Amino acid sequence: MSKKVNKNASPKNNSDSESKTIIYRPNTIDCDRIDIADWNKDGKQWNAWLNYQDPNLNSNTKILLQTKTIELKHHGIPRIGEGEDAFIKSDADREYIKIPLTPGEPGCEELEQQFQALDEYFSSDEMRTKLFGKRANGYKYVTCVKTPKIKDESDSDSDDEDTKKKKKNTKNKGKQEGPPVKYIKAKFHMIQDNGKKINRTKLIKSSGGKKEEVNADTVTEIANEVRFLSKTKYIMHVNRIWAAKSVLLGADKKMYSLGVKVMAIEYTPGASTGLNSKNLAFMSDDEDEEEVVKPTKSPNKSSQKQKQKLDSDDEDSDNEKEKEKEEDDEEEHKSSNKSSNKKSKKQDDDEDDEEEGEKIEVKKSSKKSSKKASKKQDSDEEDEEEVAKPKKKSSKAKSPSKSRS
């Protein structure tokens, strides 16, 4: 099969220097001009590298295709361990992107036509014989344009439960009712660096009329940038034909197909429906703080209590001055702070000295009560002496009590 080259769509030249990178638009590649190298049978697969005989340059170039704008309404980079992608455990299992071929989008339709032409060309009996010779019947071509498999839901009850779980997991993946959307599976350009795989697919973010290159070393970092509903453009490299060395489990023939890589992605980020932990931030606690301030007034109350204590100390100093004038009132004031019952006892002492003496004898069981009673007797008997020397009253009050005892 052959396909005419569209002369109106000339290849892109990045510069006029001796080294030029030629990029083609879809539907401009003539499959008959594809040059296929000999098989390299080293490694896990056979590989035959591809070049393109450019009719305008009369030289071999790489098969680099640039797409028009494609919106990621479907497919994209698979998620880890969700729904139909439950077998994906890490980034190593998803080093590719499914480029959707959404019906009605010019960029998708143009890309689909180009890859359908490639699939038709390389799956032909003539090409299979050219590649594998007498073993041609033992190989089956895997198309680049793929149709998602739809699981039959009319199975057992357990299958119904699994289907429900998958529906929940794939609810927000952009799937719509109607026929399944086809896609092209293209691998990211990954290289080995100190035992780790590093992405070399170029990411160019387009936003607000400005373009900037974004560094993304891992598939997770790519997925965080090229999200669902992003508007994307791709530079794709059809670089080789690969062929399996053995028959896969459940298959009857060995598989072969084209190798497709994504070399660059220009994208305008879409509105994300998921959560990105990097964008999470705590709100201010202004409202909560206002509620907390109310109970924190308790230390103010304690300060007020301290002030009251200071005031009481000042009052005590004033009372000491009053003691010099009238000591009996001071003793009644102290006894009133201890208990109301003692006030009544003191008043009775002032009214009746004999009853006071009886109460003193009753309270002699405790040392504190005996001392207070002796002080009261001394104050009643020696009023003049206490008024003359109020500051040394406590010491003189104790001495006569000891002499009497």
From Swiss-Prot:
Bias type Basic residues, positions: 365-374, 390-405
Biased composition regions of type Polar residues, renumbered to the chain: 7-16
Region described as Disordered: spans on this chain: 1-21, 150-179, 285-405
Biased composition (Acidic residues): 312-331, 349-358
Protein name, entry field: Uncharacterized protein R505
Species of origin: Acanthamoeba polyphaga mimivirus (APMV)
